[in-house]
């Protein structure tokens, strides 16, 4: 009589790939850029903690973060990053489109 076939468990390569995908910061690419930084969807990077530079979407979350991470410091309302970044200063020198120097 033959035995019942055992299903194969995950291979070491699969487990390593899964751990690598979970633990490596891959960036978001262009797909999530508007959601991470843009105004049109609200964006997730609206406010920045002045002490640890973490970004949060709203003032209530900032207050919760401040109470838990910086309890000994006084809470002051942070500035909105979108308003601060809305009008970047114009530089007099144009930037190259490709890495390297400007063509003369």
Swiss-Prot record:
InterPro entries: MBS1/2-like (IPR045230)
Compartments where located: Nucleus; Cytoplasm; Cytoplasm, Stress granule
Gene ablation phenotype (knockout): Plants lacking both MBS1 and MBS2 exhibit premature leaf senescence.
Key words of the record: Cytoplasm, Nucleus, Stress response
GO molecular function: DNA-binding transcription factor activity
Induction: Accumulates during senescence.
Keyword Secreted in annotation: no
Basic residues: bias regions: 1-11
GO biological process, one term: response to photooxidative stress
Residue span of region Disordered: 1-46, 64-104
Domain of life per record: Eukaryota
GO CC terms, sorted: cytoplasm; cytoplasmic stress granule; nucleus; plastid
Bias (Basic and acidic residues): 36-46, 73-82
The UniProt record lists the keyword Cytoplasm: yes
Function, in words: Required for acclimation to reactive oxygen species (ROS) responses downstream of beta-cyclocitral, including singlet oxygen 1O(2) detoxification reactions, especially upon light-mediated photooxidative stress, and leading to programmed cell death. Prevents leaf senescence.
Classification via PANTHER family: GEO09665P1-RELATED, PROTEIN METHYLENE BLUE SENSITIVITY 2
Protein name, UniProt field: Protein METHYLENE BLUE SENSITIVITY 2
Lineage: Eukaryota, Viridiplantae, Streptophyta, Embryophyta, Tracheophyta
């Amino acid at each position: 009589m033959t035995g019942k076939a055992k299903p194969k468990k995950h291979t070491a390569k699969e487990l390593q790939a899964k751990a690598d995908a979970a633990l490596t910061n891959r960036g978001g690419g262009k797909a999530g850029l508007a959601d991470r930084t843009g105004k049109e969807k609200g964006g997730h990077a609206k406010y920045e903690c002045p002490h640890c530079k973490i970004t949060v979407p709203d003032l209530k979350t900032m207050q919760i973060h401040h109470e838990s991470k910086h309890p000994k410091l006084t809470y002051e309302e942070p500035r909105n990053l979108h308003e601060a970044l809305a009008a970047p200063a114009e530089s007099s020198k144009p930037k190259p489109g490709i890495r390297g120097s400007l063509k003369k």
